[in-house]
Amino acid sequence: GEIVRIRDESTYRGVPEPRIHTKLNDFPSYGEQMIKFCEEIGFTLMPWQQWLAHHTLKYKPDGRWCHPVVTLLCSRQQGKSTFMALQILFRIYVLEEKLQVHTAHKLTTSAELFYKIYGIIEQNPRLAAEFTKKLESKGFQELQFTKGRRYIVRANNSAGRGIAAPETIHLDEAREYKDEDVWSALRYTQMASANPQIWVYSNAGDQHSIVLNKLRERAMAAIFGGNDDIGWFEWSAPIGIKFDNSPAFWLGVCQANPSLGITVHPD
């Protein structure tokens, strides 16, 4: 977690490894395959995104995910949504998952990602070759692919309705969920999934962020030796950091902003 200075004293690089994370393991990972897939479709993952892909896409000898629940916590404008879009595409095209469901607190947020994914597919002949249909109605969007693969966006108030056995669920803006209704509904849909994984994306929450806070409690217990296979990956500054331009301050900035010096400017 040290600051990497480049070019001159005023230029800093974000720290690729999260300040807080659950225990790492040596199981095999699809991370390299995701990094390679992204390169092939014109995207180079940033160091922190590569680190995240490597440690979250690990699987056990029986093929099941090491972390059935993964939380990515970092500040805004770091590349969370780009990572999510690329991961969704990787799961469609490389892992060939049959169903992924995506919901966010605001439908506009998930709709934005839907169009981002659709745009990437349209611009890439290799991806477009396996794409078959785009469906849209109020509170619902879907992309369909060959071999019965689907990616669905749902408004959060109907996120779990009529959906059976998605392999992966992507829950965005987790800090905004003040109760567990949507979380419970989504988890219920995965009961028949052979190898489910739920991804939770957020920036820092507050005391009302019920879903995020419960996951963080689980993660902290796991970090201190509890028996829980949750994955928690948090890029943040230490609590109580002073805004004083000191080395400690800048280390905190680098820890909270993994894209600093790449896509984010120190200002």
Where are these regions (language model features)?
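Phosphate/NTP-binding elements of NTP-utilizing enzymes
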Residues: 1-267
